[in-house]
């Protein structure tokens, strides 16, 4: 596959546009630095003066330099001990914004009949709110343990497992396809970090958004300038 720039900042490989959006039935999004502008764990750490320490681990994990993602997340969450729910709400209200084109792309996909899945190594405190605002159909993410309004530095196990890592993102994509009665090739997967690669490999169309180099190299589409809605340039009107 030879990457081709079909427009400034829009690189494709492995297919020839235009595609038909209605040929796809599901679109799966990562959240942090994909649908939204922040890495939530880094911003939460800022509330206890540990952003630099946590962000360094996050950056290494997203580049694929950390082999045990679950352990890296446990380490980061442990450093969040003492953050209050009030501070978490402030981060959501004051720092979190949708990336350019996010709402437009989700709306276009829903209008074309696609279901929308949000799979995140982040936290339900944010994914639940993002899903509600954008009308997202399915979510999977991690639950921070809270006691008396304060983070304990631990996560809560869920019926599906302990932590939503790359393998869990892939599993949730495949489970959602099975639920909808579709093939994974009828799914689009959008992400920016190494933990998005397992689900991107399963999808019929993989999309890297302002992504790490390892992700850009493997994706069918790499959006390197502009917003998420640039993906729509590849589809017939």
From Swiss-Prot:
Family annotation (NCBIfam families): HAD-SF-IB, serB
PANTHER family membership: PHOSPHOSERINE PHOSPHATASE
- Gene name per UniProt: serB
On the tree of life, the source organism's domain of life is Bacteria
What broad class of enzyme is this? hydrolase
Q: What Pfam families has UniProt attached to this entry? A: Hydrolase
Its UniProt entry gives the catalysed reaction(s) as: O-phospho-L-serine + H2O = L-serine + phosphate; O-phospho-D-serine + H2O = D-serine + phosphate
Q: What GO cellular-component annotations does this UniProt entry give? A: cytoplasm
How is this protein named in the record? Answer: Phosphoserine phosphatase
Pathway field of the UniProt record reads: Amino-acid biosynthesis; L-serine biosynthesis; L-serine from 3-phospho-D-glycerate: step 3/3
For binding Mg(2+), which residues are annotated in this chain's numbering?
Answer: 30, 32, 192
According to its UniProt entry, the protein's GO biological process terms are:
L-serine biosynthetic process
- What are its cofactors? Mg(2+)
Q: Which UniProt keywords apply?
A: Amino-acid biosynthesis, Hydrolase, Magnesium, Metal-binding, Serine biosynthesis
Binding-site residues for substrate, renumbered to this chain = 39, 76, 120-121, 169, 195
**Species name:** Albidiferax ferrireducens (strain ATCC BAA-621 / DSM 15236 / T118)
* Entry keyword annotation includes Amino-acid biosynthesis: yes
